[in-house]
Every structure is written in C-alpha cells, then in structure tokens.
C-alpha cells in the first residue's frame, strides 16, 4: 500500500488546481455559493455524509450578512459561473456552511478539522508581476479576492478529505470536516457554533497558512489571536437648511466625529494589549444640509476577553455620550465577534509530534509572540473546551508575495501538501483506544 507521504504528494496537482479555481472565482462572506457547491460535490463523491446550509448555520446568529439584493445578485452570479445545480439550493440566502462526517463504525472520539472558504472585499492586482494575474487565475469577480489564503484552506480541507478516506481503515471514531463561511470580519463561526456543529467534538483543529510564519515552520498552538467585537453605529439626527435654519438641525455628522475622537482616546488596559479602530465614517447628504444621518464602522480588540469587553464598554459609553451631546439618536448593531485563543496543551503537544514527522517541516513549535489579529474559530475552540474537549489552532508557515489583505497577496503552494499530511497524521496516528 502506498505511504501517506506518497499519496499526499500525488494529490499536489489537485491541491493546486482547487486552490487556483477557488482563487479565480473568489467569493466573499455569506456568498460562497459556487465554492460551497464544488466542495459539497467533492465530499459527496468521496462518500462523506453531508450536512449543509441551514442544517449547520443558525439563521439568527449570522453577523454582517449582505442585504437581500446582494445575496440574490451573487447567487445568480454563482450560477452563471458554474455553481452546481444539485447543491446550490441548500446554500441560497447566505447559508454557505458545510459539515462532512466520516463515521468509521469503530469506537473512538470525534475529531474535527475546520477550514474557512471566504474571500475579502478587495480588488486584486492586475499586473504581470503578480503570479495569479500572470498565470490566469486572478479573481474574475470585481471587489472580491482571496487575499488571506482561504482558497488554500479550502483546498487543504478537500485534500484532507481525500487522504482520510484513502486511509480510512486506520481510523477510529468519527471525523468531521467543517467548511466555514464568512470568517473575514469574524462573522461566520458563531452561527455554526449555535447550530451545534462542534457540540460532540472531542478534538478540534483549525487551520491557517502564512501570518508571517516562515516556510517550514508549523505553529501548533497559536494563542496570539485577540478577542474582538465588530459593530456599526448608526446616528440619526434632524436635517435642516444649513444657512437659513441651522438651529433646527441635529447634526449626526458632528456626533459621529466626536464619537470617533473619543473612541481613539480610550485608555489602554494595564493587563494587556487593547485596540480600537473606526475604519469607516459616512455622513451627510448635501453641502447645504445639516447632516441627519451618520454611520461608523468600528472594531475593538483585546488580548483577553476581559480586555476586549473593557474597550467595548468604554466605546459604547463614548458613542452614547456623543449622541447625547448633539441631541441625536444612535443605534449599534453587532457585525462580528471572536474570543481570545487558548489552545489545549496536550492537543498542542500531539500536533507538534505529528508535524515534526512531515517532510518539509523544519520546526514544529508551540507558539509565536507576534499578535495575529483576530479569528472566529476561537469560538469553536471555546465551545469544544466547554464540553471538556481539546482544541488548537495551527498555522503553517509559507513564503508570501505580499502581506495578508493586500491586493498582491499570493503564497507558495507547497504548503498545501505539508498541511494535508500533518493533519492526516494527527488523525491516523492518534491513539484511539486510550486518547491523549
């Protein structure tokens, strides 16, 4: 029987093909319709049991959902770009989640692996110096680009599905492969958690590539993700003639501006790093009109859930105070959230032991010091740990052409096979009878 390494290496062309296809047809959060249908078909052909759409995505827990017009427009766009008719109805309306299950029929725990599928709202570089453009797989969808590696993550998930099915006789218990929508903006994981997809999981691993980790290094217990809350603040004032009757107006723009300054003046927390950022401010309707509406798009972050909550609470106070100062109303809407990461030490050690055996891995380390933004797979990790399971977040280093969320982002595709083999070893070599 061919070895695990030989089999994974034989998948390398497919891994590259999948990654480039997903890259070319990039789809951002909650509209990954084409991507989801291709993933579902591949998993179905392998014999996995599938739970799709509303079965694995809680409707009321979705955050940052596009409006109905956008959802329908992107649904039609996906159909025109080759979304598979036999699957697409399951995902209509922004329910683009998939859970594939392989039940071996042999006693053992439930082991889950999570990858994300969404692209960013970003226009890709259109220059021959950019490999995806030069080689013909740059995004064909305006304003949507895989600039964080999720195309690679989806390919890794499919490669892992093929590998575990090939070596199924060496497995025990149940394998769950989770394909998550809308990670960008930390919008999608909570809806899958609230649908119960990880409630039965004993061992959980989430996956990312890059993030500044050098090629050949695998970080097996990334604990540097910050807790975060994303929200919009809508200010509502009263319009008036700016020249004739300015005193009749209540200026929403000034309230939003005052709130912005106050937000960026929130004192840091003594127990760890904190962040606040107003990324967007939109206001007004005309030069000679007292602005009656304004919008702020805001995020808070903290090295711990406690610190993030501190910043968020102060932010709400600042926003309410600014609204009161200018006599306007304000409403905030939650758009995304994630907790800080806290990997399980025993599971991290097991992941390290398996990554160290993979060709192309120079070092398998526990953690890195540099902050890595935020990631909503931490919500899945936390739920698994609440149920006495173990969880971790693994980062596979790779050479990047440009940083994450940059229009020139690209990565060395050799990392795909390294990730597949590492994750497969994690399951295939697991001591099913005694656990860890």
UniProtKB/Swiss-Prot annotation:
Cofactor(s) for this UniProt protein: Mn(2+)
Root EC class: hydrolase
GO biological process: folic acid catabolic process
Enzyme Commission number(s) from the entry: 3.5.1.-
Pfam families the UniProt entry points to: M20_dimer, Peptidase_M20
Swiss-Prot/TrEMBL keywords: Hydrolase
InterPro entries reported for this sequence: AbgA (IPR033845), Amidohydrolase (IPR017439), Bact_exopeptidase_dim_dom (IPR036264), Peptidase_M20 (IPR002933), Peptidase_M20/M20A_hydrolases (IPR052030), Peptidase_M20_dimer (IPR011650)
GO CC term, one of those recorded: catalytic complex
Coiled-coil annotated residue ranges, if any: none
Entry's induction text: Could be transcriptionally regulated by AbgR.
MF terms in GO: dipeptidase activity; para-aminobenzoyl-glutamate hydrolase activity; protein heterodimerization activity
Superkingdom: Bacteria
Family annotation (PANTHER family): PEPTIDASE M20, PEPTIDASE M20 DIMERISATION DOMAIN-CONTAINING PROTEIN
Cited function: Component of the p-aminobenzoyl-glutamate hydrolase multicomponent enzyme system which catalyzes the cleavage of p-aminobenzoyl-glutamate (PABA-GLU) to form p-aminobenzoate (PABA) and glutamate. AbgAB does not degrade dipeptides and the physiological role of abgABT should be clarified.
Subunit record text: Forms a heterodimer with AbgB.
Family: Belongs to the peptidase M20 family.
Protein name: p-aminobenzoyl-glutamate hydrolase subunit A
Source organism per UniProt: Escherichia coli (strain K12)
């Amino acid at each position: 029987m061919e070895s695990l390494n030989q089999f994974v290496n034989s998948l390398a062309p497919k891994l590259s093909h999948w990654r480039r296809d997903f890259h070319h047809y990039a789809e951002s959060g909650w509209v990954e319709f084409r991507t989801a249908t291709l993933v579902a078909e591949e998993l179905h052909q392998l014999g996995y049991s599938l739970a799709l759409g509303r079965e694995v995505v809680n409707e009321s827990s979705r955050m940052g959902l596009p409006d109905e017009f956008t959802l329908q427009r992107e649904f039609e766009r996906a159909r025109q770009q080759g979304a598979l008719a036999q699957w697409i109805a399951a995902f209509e309306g922004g329910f683009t989640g998939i859970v594939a299950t392989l039940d071996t029929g042999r006693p053992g725990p439930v082991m889950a692996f999570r990858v994300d599928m969404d692209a960013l709202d970003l226009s890709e570089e259109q220059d021959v110096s950019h490999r995806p453009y030069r080689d013909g797989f740059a995004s064909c969808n305006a304003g949507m680009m895989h600039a964080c590696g999720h195309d690679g993550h989806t390919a890794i998930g499919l490669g892992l599905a093929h590998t575990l099915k090939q070596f199924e006789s060496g497995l025990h218990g149940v394998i769950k492969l989770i394909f998550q929508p809308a990670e960008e903006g930390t919008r999608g994981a909570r809806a899958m958690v609230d649908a119960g997809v990880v409630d039965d999981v004993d061992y959980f691993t989430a996956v990312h590539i890059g993030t500044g980790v050098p090629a050949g290094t695998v970080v097996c217990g990334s604990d540097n993700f910050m807790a975060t809350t994303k929200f919009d603040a809508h200010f509502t004032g009263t319009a008036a003639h700016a020249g004739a009757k300015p005193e009749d107006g209540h200026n929403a723009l000034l309230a939003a501006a005052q709130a912005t300054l106050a937000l960026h003046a929130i004192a840091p927390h003594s127990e760890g790093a904190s962040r606040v950022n107003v990324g967007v401010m939109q206001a007004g309707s005309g030069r000679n009109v007292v602005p009656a509406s304004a919008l702020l798009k805001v995020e808070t972050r903290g090295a711990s859930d406690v610190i993030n909550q501190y910043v968020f609470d102060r932010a709400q106070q600042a926003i309410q105070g600014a609204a009161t100062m200018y006599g306007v109303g304000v409403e905030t809407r939650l758009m995304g959230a994630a907790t800080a990461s806290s990997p399980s030490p025993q599971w991290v050690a097991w992941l390290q032991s398996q990554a160290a055996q993979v060709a192309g891995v120079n070092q398998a380390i526990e953690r890195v010091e540099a902050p890595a933004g935020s990631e909503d797979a931490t919500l899945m990790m936390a739920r698994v740990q609440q149920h006495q399971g173990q969880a971790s977040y693994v980062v596979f280093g790779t050479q990047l052409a440009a940083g994450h969320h940059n229009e020139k982002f690209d990565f060395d595709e050799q990392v795909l096979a390294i990730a597949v083999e590492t994750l497969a070893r994690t399951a295939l070599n697991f001591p099913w009878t005694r656990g860890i």
